[in-house]
Amino acid sequence: HYCPSCGERVFTYGAEGHGRTEIRCGYCGLPLEMTESVRPAGSGCVVVVDDDRFFLTLLTDLLTQEGLAAEVLSCESGASFLTQLTQRFRREQPVRLAILDIVMSPLDGVAAALALRALERGFDRGEAIPILFFSAAKATEALRTAMGRCAPAYYLNKGSDATPERLAARMRELFGRVFAGGGAARRPA
C-alpha cells in the first residue's frame, strides 16, 4: 500500500474502528483504505509553522493555490505560533488546522502541539484543532506516542522527492481524510 502521509509504499496492519476493519500505515497509523474520498472546501484558517522559509512559503502557497484554506497564517517558530493562536483565541477566531514542523528550535513541533492543547483547555474550546505534523523524518514510535497525546493529530512526510505537485497531491488526499468527518474533532476528556 502507498501512504500519502509517508510518501512511499509501507507495510500495513488492520485496526478495528468505526464498525469496520481499516487498513492502516505501519509507520504513521493513517487509515489507507477509506470508503469515500472527500475534497475539502477551502474554508477557515490553516496555521503553518516551519522554521525553514522554503517549506513555510511552499506550504502557504500550496494551501492557497489548491483551495485548501481560505486563510493561511504563517509562523516561523513555535513561540510565534503560540502567540498568534492566543490572539486568535482571544478574538474567538477559529482555526481549522495547524501544520507543525517537528524539528524546530528552541520550541519543537511536539512541544508546540502540547502547548496548543493546553491553550485550548485554558480557553475552554470544545473542539480540538487537528494537527498535521510535517517532517522529513519517518514517523517514529515517539512521534506516534506524541500524536496520541495531541489527538486529533496526523503526520505528513516532506518526502525526499517532493516536487510541489507531488506534495500538493499528497496534501489534498490527506486533507480529504482529515476532514472526511466534517472538520475538527472533540477534544479528548
Feature map (PLM): residue ranges:
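Non-catalytic signal-transmission and effector/linker regions of two-component phosphorelay proteins
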Residues: 1-45, 60, 66, 124-127, ...
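Active-site residues of response regulator receiver
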Residues: 96, 101-105
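The feature encodes the CheY-like receiver
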Residues: 105-108, 139
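Short amphipathic alpha-helix used as the core "switch/output" element in two-component signaling
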Residues: 110-126
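As written
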Residues: 145-156
